Curated annotation (Swiss-Prot):
Reactions the enzyme catalyzes: Hydrolytically removes 5'-nucleotides successively from the 3'-hydroxy termini of 3'-hydroxy-terminated oligonucleotides
The name this protein goes by in its record: Fanconi-associated nuclease 1 homolog
Cofactor: Mn(2+); Mg(2+)
GO BP annotations listed: interstrand cross-link repair
Annotated keywords: Coiled coil, Hydrolase, Magnesium, Manganese, Metal-binding, Nuclease
Gene Ontology CC entries for this record: nucleus
Domain of life the protein comes from: Eukaryota
Binding site for Mn(2+) 2: E899, D1023
Record function comment: Nuclease required for the repair of DNA interstrand cross-links (ICL). Acts as a 5'-3' exonuclease that anchors at a cut end of DNA and cleaves DNA successively at every third nucleotide, allowing to excise an ICL from one strand through flanking incisions.
Residue spans of biased composition, Low complexity class: 41-79, 118-154, 182-202, 467-485
Length: 1087
């Protein structure tokens, strides 16, 4: 462990506890998880011997040796201590906890200070229990209460016995700090016997109160640490284990709080003065003592002028402080913080007027302004990042923010059991031993047969024995090498307790992810291409070592270095293609094709290799590559195969080749084509890049939004309400109209009624009609809202004259739709606010006159909330929305624009219990997973083959009622984070109708495609799903055959758009099943 005062190496054991060190939060004793169980608050010690008294002089010498003068308590890592101003008594039970104390002493540092036992004299002998059995019963009762009320009850508790226990069996939980001791100066002796007679003993209630006071982020942090430490303890070295055990067992609560706070902040450096004046003091009693504790145990380190660079802490300064340091340079005040940091870094730059470096001057100024600062030790940060990676199995998550969000927002995850290393039963062990014996017998028999055959070969073919032996030796060597390669890179999850079998594999993966993050930052920031090429060269070297290796579990390959290097090289191909370095891309692609990683990208790699050869005018080579990919690659997806077949047909045109080899073309000439429909609509040009084209509807679409309003009800009679309402409305409404007219004229906007706007839109350009339609909607809302707001203002300014139900809109009530194009940002809201101010000032005098007259009649008002509906007309939409309007008016179809999302949702819901089956090993490594680790891989189907096949058969023979049963069971998990499920987009009623229209057979057919090849069929489905319920009696129609409803799949294409390869595959699959599929072409009416 690192220390700031001495130049010492890292300790291989927990650091010693300073006997002269005082911590105000400890309140007289070292608090750790061991003390939580060892210090019995209900059991007195055994017969004490002789008390040792200290004089006042000795107490003064003790005070001088302490670093903090808050109390006079000495600290020992084991013994209980109770102290007053004149006497210090330390005692512990020798007979009850002898074995446990010896084990804890072995785990501590040999250099830790040993304080002799100071046992009290005969004053405490009367408090000894009568029998030892009562003492053991009291201990058991106390530990049961603690176990029930502990928030981090993750592991098994320590049993109260006298037998020897291992260190790993201790309960790893958060320590608690005892309350302050109430010492007096008049007493001369104290006893550590019963709680009633001792003021320093911490009761169970006090400990439970301290546990409840712990923040949720600290609990989450400890849960993550404890879970990973127990499950993956083999991945940590001794120094890292010391850090983890010190965090869980040795540090007090305040130190833990401070460390977690600093770890979750952006650092790395923090000013101590800022920490002491922050809000942390509300939850941490003594921040200074917590910092000293963390520094002593090696978690934090102080800034040192000799050890660290002052530029690391310069970022803590504010912009005004940086300007004062760099005041000697003529730098514009408008410059950013980075400019001033670059200036005070001391590096020479253009415009520097001195030959000598001002670095020492800047260094002194920065250090004086920053003051004392601390940071978390780099090794500690990397350790806990690794712990969080192993807990969440997400290398983009470095802290417990997802757990914090889960606690705050109430986000739920599916119910499953996280995989743990299970102890094999005796029956399983015997069966495995029998199988091993059988395998050994078979291997021995095979060896004997081979030896006999070799003898026969030697006698018959003596002349060619040398050559045959050499060949056999070579073959055996090759087989041995292959076996070694498989063992080296194969991840056998049936034997290992973790996906990472050893520490070396974990560290390699961590370094590879850091390299990937660095390369992405270089690419996004437009960094040096030379640095990026150096990273790619490392990837090439490392990936070349694992090209010929084989693996069993493809989902576990995600956590290997080869997978990461493959991804880096894959996305870098696009960069070099833009730079027209086609040969370099081909070299990368040839290596990627030979690797076993990222099989879903193989089709993309083959296509890019063919295209790059075309760029280099190597058509013959491109043709050979296309043929090789179709012949030899069994991992080609259907859409990728269709694209390569198109390249093959193009390259095989005469005179290069007159005939394509048989068996290579599987899709190009066999795909079924859908029916084509063309509709014409007037296009609205928005002249904005990156936005879809919009087309006018035949009839405006009506959209209803709900607005929350507060109603202030007066206690006056209805007659008075009607009188005041008529007087106010007649005066205010005329002013509203005049004010809106002036505002609109100044903004060059014309007021039109909806009828006038529709009649005039025919004589306007599309963009003018779009503006007018938007403004009509805005003005209609604005005028109504202005009237309500004026009534609100008059009632607030003149509360005693209010006599009607006044509607108060929320400030954000204008933003009532997700369609931003309907409301130009801030325009209508600004008009409304100006109207409110002007009209309020104009009627203020009348309100003051009415205030005096109605002051005596005004009663107390009551507030209520109501929801009102607001109707908005939408005049234009996307090609999909226009198509939905067309099929609604022509055939009465109902439908949604969903593409593949609705079918993935149905697939997950109908297979929920199979997907989240905890019996599949190693697929659930964290409680924060929205899907198993193998979801979407080849192993997902093979490991659950029987269950999936049975569910598909059940769906094929299901009627509507059977589908509803499965759907309702899965809907009980509504709100859980599940991959592919959006609970808010569709309701249970909508899913039920869609399931009824689709039928069990079609749902089973689509589910089989998603199960067997999720990566290919999880995209590319037609845009629209249409359904229509026929007006027939359900009694006369068999729901099982789905004759009472009709469905239609529609792929929508705009001008210049065409079907993609995977879309053509989906269309062919649906038509082959018997579905009605169409392609709707939306074209501009003018053209």
């Amino acid at each position: 462990m690192k220390s700031n005062t001495k130049n010492s190496v890292k300790r291989k054991s927990p650091p010693p506890v300073n006997p002269n060190k005082k911590f105000p939060s400890f309140e007289g004793k070292q608090t750790s998880i061991k003390d939580f169980f060892f210090n019995d608050t209900t059991t007195p010690p055994k017969t004490p011997t002789q008390p040792i008294r200290f004089t006042q002089n000795n107490n003064k010498e003790n005070d001088k040796s302490n670093n903090n003068n808050n109390n006079n308590n000495t600290i020992t890592p084991i013994k209980k201590t109770t102290t007053t101003t004149t006497v210090v008594v330390e005692s512990f039970d020798d007979s009850r906890n002898t074995n446990l104390i010896q084990q804890f002493q072995k785990a501590s540092t040999p250099s830790s200070p040993q304080i002799p036992n100071k046992l009290p004299q005969q004053e405490n002998q009367q408090q000894i229990p009568n029998t030892q059995q009562q003492q053991i019963k009291q201990l058991q009762q106390q530990q049961q209460q603690q176990q029930q009320e502990s928030p981090n009850n993750l592991f098994k508790t320590i049993k109260t016995t006298t037998t020897t226990e291992t260190f790993e069996e201790f309960l790893l939980s958060q320590p608690t700090t005892p309350p302050p001791s109430n010492t007096t100066t008049t007493t001369t002796t104290t006893s550590s016997s019963s709680p009633s007679s001792s003021n320093n003993i911490t009761t169970i209630d006090d400990k439970n109160n301290l546990i409840k006071n712990n923040r949720y982020y600290l609990n989450d942090f400890l849960i993550v640490t404890e879970t990973v430490y127990k499950r993956d303890k083999h991945l940590f070295i001794n120094d890292e284990k010391d850090y983890i055990e010190g965090m869980i067992e040795t540090l007090d609560r305040d130190s833990q709080h401070l460390f977690v706070r600093l770890y979750n902040r952006k650092g790395p450096w923090f000013q101590i003065n800022e920490l002491k004046s922050s809000n942390y003091q509300n939850e941490i009693k003594n921040i200074g003592a917590a910092i000293e504790s963390l520094v002593e145990y090696g978690f934090l380190e102080y800034y040192s002028s000799d050890k660290h660079d002052y530029n690391e802490i310069a970022n803590l300064l504010k912009i005004d402080q940086l300007k004062s340091i760099a005041s000697s340079f003529s730098i514009p005040n408008s410059s950013g913080k980075e400019t001033f940091l670059k200036v005070i870094s001391g590096e020479p730059f253009k415009g520097q007027s001195t030959l000598f470096s001002p670095k020492p001057i800047y260094k002194k100024k920065v250090e004086n302004l920053v003051g004392e600062s601390i940071k978390i030790v780099t090794e500690v940060v990397e350790l806990w990042r690794m712990i969080h990676h192993l807990y969440f199995y997400s290398w983009s998550t470095h802290d417990s923010k997802s757990m914090i969000v889960n606690n705050i927002m109430g986000i739920k995850y599916p119910e499953y059991t996280v995989w743990k290393s299970k102890v094999k039963k005796e029956v399983q062990q015997k069966e495995e031993e029998v199988e091993k014996e059988k395998e050994e017998i078979l291997q021995n028999q095979l060896i004997q047969v081979k030896q006999e055959s070799d003898v026969i070969d030697l006698t018959q073919n003596s002349s060619g024995s040398s050559n045959n032996n050499n060949n056999n030796n070579n073959n055996n060597n090759n087989n041995n090498n292959n076996n070694n390669n498989i063992k080296e890179y194969d991840i056998d999850l049936t034997e290992n307790e973790s996906i990472f079998p050893n520490r070396e594999s974990l560290l390699k993966y961590e370094n590879a992810r850091k390299l990937e993050e660095k390369s992405i930052n270089l690419y996004e920031s437009g960094g040096d291409l030379v640095a990026l090429e150096s990273i790619l060269q490392v990837c090439l070297d490392e990936l070349g070592r694992s090209v010929s290796k084989k693996v069993k579990y493809s989902f576990a390959l995600k956590f290997t270095v080869g997978w990461v290097y493959t991804r880096i090289l894959s996305w870098s191909i696009d960069i070099f293609e833009k730079l027209r370095k086609y040969q370099q891309c081909i070299d990368f692609l040839m290596l990627l094709i030979e690797s076993p990683y990222c099989r879903g990208k193989r089709g993309y790699w083959w296509q890019r290799m063919i295209i790059n050869h075309k760029h280099l005018h190597r058509s013959d080579d491109a043709l050979l590559i296309a043929e090789r990919s179709l012949k030899e690659d069994p991992f080609l997806r259907s859409g990728d195969r269709l694209a390569i077949e198109k390249h093959l047909i193009q390259l095989s045109s005469p005179p290069r080749r007159w005939r394509i080899p048989a068996g290579l073309i599987q899709f190009s000439y066999k795909l079924k084509e859908p029916i084509s429909t063309t509709i014409y609509r007037e296009k609205v040009s928005n002249n904005q890049q990156g936005y879809k084209s919009k087309y006018l509807f035949l009839t405006p679409q009506i959209k209803i939004n709900k607005i929350k309003k507060i109603i202030i009800k007066s206690s006056q009679s209805q007659n008075n309400q009607q009188k005041v309402q008529s007087s106010l409305s007649s005066q205010i409404q005329t002013q509203i109209q005049t004010q809106i007219q002036t505002q609109i004229q100044s903004s060059q906007i014309q007021i039109q009624s909806p009828i006038q706007s529709q009649s005039q839109s025919q004589n306007q350009t599309p963009i003018q009609s779009q503006i007018n339609n938007n403004n009509n909607n805005i003005l209609a809302i604005s005028s109504q809202k202005s009237f309500d707001s004026i009534l609100t203002t008059t009632s607030i300014n003149n509360t005693q004259s209010s006599s009607q139900n006044i509607y108060i809109d929320e400030e954000t009530s204008l933003e009532i739709t997700s369609d931003d194009e309907l409301f130009p940002p801030g325009q209508s809201y600004k008009i409304e606010k100006e109207n409110q101010l002007q009209i309020t000032n104009s009627v203020k005098k009348e309100e003051e006159q009415e205030e005096e007259e109605e002051e005596e009649e005004e009663g107390q008002g009551q507030e209520e909330e109501e929801e009102e509906e607001e109707i908005i007309e939408i005049t234009h939409g996307t090609v999909e929305e226009v198509s939905l309007e067309h099929y609604s008016q022509n055939g009465g179809w109902e439908g949604i624009h969903c593409e593949t999302s609705i079918f993935i949702t149905l697939y997950v819901l109908y297979f929920w219990d199979i997907i989240f089956d905890s019996n599949v090993p190693h697929v659930f490594q964290s409680p924060f997973q929205n899907s198993p680790l193998d979801f979407g891989s080849d192993e997902f189907y093979f490991t659950r083959k029987e269950a999936i096949d049975n569910r598909i058969k059940r769906l094929e023979h299901s009627n509507y009622d059977d589908l509803l049963i499965l759907l309702n069971q899965s809907w009980l998990h509504n709100g859980c984070e599940a991959r592919g499920v959006n609970w808010k987009s569709t309701s249970l009623e909508q899913l039920s109708i869609i399931s009824k229209c689709l039928g069990g057979k079609l749902i089973a057919f689509i589910s089989r495609l998603l199960t067997e090849d999720f990566k290919s069929f999880s995209h590319g489905m037609p845009d629209l799903l249409l359904w229509k319920l026929n007006n027939n009696n359900d009694d006369d129609i068999d729901d099982k055959n789905n004759n009472n409803s009709s469905i239609k799949f529609v792929e929508v294409k705009g001008t210049g758009d065409r079907l993609r390869d995977q879309q053509r595959i989906w269309i062919d699959m649906l038509i082959s099943f018997g579905c009605d599929v169409e392609v709707c072409l939306v074209k501009n009416k003018k053209n």
